[in-house]
Amino acid sequence: MLYQQISQNKQGTVVLLVVFFALLALIGASAGYLLLDNYAMGLVLALVIGVIYATSMIFQSTSLVMSMNNAREVTEKEAPGFFHIVEDMAMVAQIPMPRVFIIEDPSLNAFATGSSPQNAAVAATTGLLEVMNREELEGVIGHEISHIRNYDIRISTIAVALASAVTVISSIGGRMLWYGGGSRRQRDDGDDDVLRIITLLLSLLSLLLAPLVASLIQLAISRQREYLADASSVELTRNPQGMIKALEKLQLSQPMKHPVDDASAALYINEPRKKRSFSSLFSTHPPIEERIERLKNM
């Protein structure tokens, strides 16, 4: 059951990424049709923008991400218990030892960052380290190490970059149309051809809806990788109860004291900001109740 769930989560992410690239291609083709009367050029430009966004974000410095989250790097001497758990989990996962950081915050939370296992880092709040016992900490750190081993940070970064690219292309296309852009043929032909009108309307609709759809796909990928990291943590620790107990404590945690931006929020094991009342479709994290239920059903 454990390996089946891991496989299903990975397959789900692949499907979502394929849909994401299809959406990027669609919005590019739509913008190309409306502005240049050239589907292919719009599609190519959209994919180029997406690749540039993704590449620039993937190589964002680990130290910069940690600095943005008020995390301080610690040595084995400063935090031996935490350090050794990270070391043990990294050894089991067969990845290089990540750098270790602590965030001075009473809330219960942790996250990992780094585009690859070779430049990764793990951070935990002081609240988490004080409240959780070793069994629970192993579950949490196993979760974060799994994010590193599964290249989740890279996948999530690509998803954020693609969502940003879709939004930028949609915004540029909309503004150009509003201020009198559009292809010469669409302005001058006066063609009442039904197919052309339908294509025009569908292209306009895709420009309007694409940013929302892109955001929903990006958030779905984030939630999918959280489920995968939970299951992968159990694979590393061989102890589902440790992860379940940790999630039960995380469920009671208060929001973090310092502001957390959207990109950083998706990295944490638990939503670091005040819980929102709207649909889970717009959340970076699955409901903790569902995460616990999945672990119990393994």
Swiss-Prot record:
Gene3D superfamilies: Metalloproteases ('zincins'), catalytic domain
UniProt keyword annotation of Magnesium present: no
Cellular component terms per the entry's GO annotation: plasma membrane
Residue stretches spanning the membrane: 14-34, 39-59, 158-178, 197-217
Top-level enzyme category: hydrolase
Cofactor note: Binds 1 zinc ion per subunit.
Record's keyword annotation contains DNA repair: no
A Pfam family recorded for this sequence: Peptidase_M48
Mode of membrane association: Multi-pass membrane protein
Enzyme active site: E144
NCBIfam families in UniProt: PRK04897.1 (NF003425)
Protein name per the record: Protease HtpX homolog
Species of provenance: Streptococcus pyogenes serotype M6 (strain ATCC BAA-946 / MGAS10394)
Gene name of the record: htpX
